[in-house]
Amino acid sequence: MEEDEVAESWEEAADSGEIDRRLEKKLKISQRENSKSKSPPKAPVVIQDDSLPSGPPPQIRILKRPTSNGLASNPNACSRPAAPVKSLAQREAEYAEARKRILGSASPEEEQEKPVADRPARINQAEEIRQPNNVIRQPLGPDGSQGFRQRR
């Protein structure tokens, strides 16, 4: 019945020693459970001695790579066929063809001259017309009063 009694406040419980008794009781219960669970391990622990031989060493297998088309694969050979070497003229022709297909022009020289002439005129004018920004401050109010300097 002692556990069923509830103190009005924790201060009363601390003064009467009730909190200490309950803590000691719970501590004894947990210590009993720990001592029961600390029984010796059921499985034996085997400690190997280095002086005794320790069975055969593990076997190591060296596996070979699978062969393709009956030939052993060469580490330097690629699985895809080697592309034929193209001359400079062939590469330039293919580049020009692709450029024409994508961009609409075959030579890069046309594109380099074009952006200079296409520059918008408005940007050029804005750089020349810019004036410095001067801020004009009026320390007095609009009606001649002190404005922000006025003390209340």
Curated annotation (Swiss-Prot):
Residue ranges constituting the SUZ-C domain according to the UniProt record: 111-152
Taxonomy, superkingdom: Eukaryota
Composition bias, Polar residues: 66-77
Database matches in InterPro entries: SUZ, SUZ-C, SZRD1
Compositional bias of kind Basic and acidic residues: 89-100, 113-130
Domain SUZ: 42-107
Annotated stretches, region: Disordered: 28-152
Similarity-based family: Belongs to the SZRD1 family.
Protein's name according to its UniProt entry: SUZ RNA-binding domain-containing
Organism the protein comes from: Xenopus tropicalis
